[in-house]
Amino acid sequence: MDYKSAGVDVEAGRAFVQRIKSSVEATHRQEVVGGLGGFGGMMRLPAGLRQPLLVSGTDGVGTKLELAQDHQAHHNVGIDLVAMCVNDVITSGAQPLFFLDYMATGALSPDAMAEVVEGIADGCQQSGCSLLGGETAEMPGFYPAGRYDLAGFCVAVVEENELIDGQQVQPGDAVIGVASSGVHSNGFSLVRRVLAQAKADRSTLYGPDQRPLIDDLLRPTQLYASLVKHLLSSSLPIHAMAHITGGGLPENLPRCLPTGCRAQVSPTSWARPPLFDWLQSAGGIPERDLWHTFNLGIGFCVVVPRDQIDRTVAACRAQQLQAWPIGSIVEGNPEDGVIGLPD
């Protein structure tokens, strides 16, 4: 008996590393020291920083992975993994520096795993961060053959005196909602139940334009790193930012607000994408659950002074992202919920 007969193919693992090497190295910023193969990835801090704060975040893709693996959308979930981490850390105004990934699988499928890493590298390049390292664990008997799980870890940096922590938010500020690319990577346990109930498959179309349902559900999470970089370089006075993930607007928008402030949102200020209408109709999902599970078309929020609405919306659209003034800040407290949305 040897390791391969026990289910772990070391040679396939080595071949996999060689296959992904060029994709990984293409993400490396000039601050990266060394290459693949060491025990730890190394990176210098960007030059010129005076009081740098490191901002870290970790996340996964959740059960979207099951749907993606059923339909071989491996590249997409690689992008999702980066987006779920990067979109969190940039809310502080931080610049993504590097990313690490962890993949665990029952049996190594070099083609599928390479597509995942190429997706991760794609997401890193879009975000301006280096894919500094990772781990691929082949765990036969623990995970089913042909299935894998993902986790990601991102580190970003911001000057301490440029940190965006929500403390500048005040009543009268405006809330700008930036469009999502779809469901993103939250709520897929519910999505999969709806698909099963509706007996939906690859041929299912939805909405007035009869779009392919599965393709739209598996569209990668929108990355907002280049948008935030553009907003900051435009010298816009950003008071707070929020990444709209699990819990939707009602649970994520209050997270960026200080004591004494509460958000008020008008649900009719943007058009809800038909994809969410299909999910609600096919699954009989109550309106409250819909709001507290999905982003409903708003993937990121920016809080700015009211006189900066037009500049902020224009800056978003310059990055090919739709944006709308969706609400305002009023007196109150974040824990009291968002006025205008289901509690």
UniProtKB/Swiss-Prot annotation:
GO molecular function annotation: ATP binding; phosphoribosylamine-glycine ligase activity; phosphoribosylformylglycinamidine cyclo-ligase activity
Give the metabolic or biological pathway: Purine metabolism; IMP biosynthesis via de novo pathway; 5-amino-1-(5-phospho-D-ribosyl)imidazole from N(2)-formyl-N(1)-(5-phospho-D-ribosyl)glycinamide: step 2/2
Listed under catalytic activity are:
2-formamido-N(1)-(5-O-phospho-beta-D-ribosyl)acetamidine + ATP = 5-amino-1-(5-phospho-beta-D-ribosyl)imidazole + ADP + phosphate + H(+)
Source organism, top-level taxon: Bacteria
Major place of residence: cytoplasm
Alphabetically ordered keywords of this record: ATP-binding, Cytoplasm, Ligase, Nucleotide-binding, Purine biosynthesis
Q: What is its EC number?
A: 6.3.3.1
One GO cellular-component annotation of the UniProt record comes to: cytosol
Task: Name one process (GO BP) from the record.
Answer: 'de novo' IMP biosynthetic process
Pfam annotation, one family: AIRS
**Location of the protein in the cell:** Cytoplasm
Gene3D superfamilies xref list: PurM-like C-terminal domain, PurM-like, N-terminal domain
Which family does the record assign?
A: Belongs to the AIR synthase family.
Name of the protein described by the UniProt record = Phosphoribosylformylglycinamidine cyclo-ligase
UniProt source species: Parasynechococcus marenigrum (strain WH8102)
